[in-house]
Regions:
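Conserved beta-strand in the GNAT
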Residues: 54-56, 123
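Vicinal oxygen chelate
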Residues: 1, 4-14, 32, 44-47, 65-139, ...
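A short, local hydrophobic-aromatic micro-motif
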Residues: 6, 30-32, 76, 100
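Core segments of cupin and vicinal oxygen chelate
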Residues: 2, 9-52
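Short, small-residue-rich loop/turn micro-motifs
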Residues: 50, 57-59
Length: 139
């Protein structure tokens, strides 16, 4: 059996702004569920039939804002494989999202990075090869 990430659950301040970000990056994403949990907190599943992001409304404000790559425990970014990173970049740039792409050149892949409205970093990668040894080359 192939292992895959079925979903990720992220607590956010503004669910609707996050939905807009995700649907800008992935126009095929749909709202799978939008409701209020037993604790009175809104949560939404946005994605496809096979993968999604669960967005949960923040109920407690953190002492410090999370900053990706700060060296503190937490998720630095989530990465999605896409067919064409240039289209994703164009869509996100047109919508005003912050491009955080670091210089990266590789013969077998192209990567871009963007911040969502919550300050989380997202990676989008396009592979130019179907060969695992080339896709997994980190030189």
């Amino acid at each position: 059996m192939d292992i895959r990430l079925e979903h990720a659950n992220i607590c956010v301040h503004d669910i609707d702004r996050m939905i807009k970000f995700l649907r800008t990056a992935f126009p095929e994403f749909k709202i799978r569920y939008d409701g209020i949990g037993a604790d009175g907190v809104r949560w939404v599943h946005v994605g496809t039939e096979t993968t999604y992001i669960a967005l949960e409304q923040v109920s407690i404000q953190p002492e410090n804002k999370w900053i990706p790559y700060s060296g503190k425990p937490g998720v630095n970014h989530l990465a999605y494989e896409v067919e064409n990173v240039d289209i994703v970049r164009e869509n996100l740039n047109s919508a005003g999202y912050k491009d955080t792409t670091i210089p990266n050149n590789h013969p077998y892949r192209k990567r871009i990075y963007f911040n969502d409205p919550e300050g989380n970093d997202w990676e989008f990668v396009q592979y130019y090869s179907d060969k695992n040894n080339e896709r997994n080359d980190y030189t």
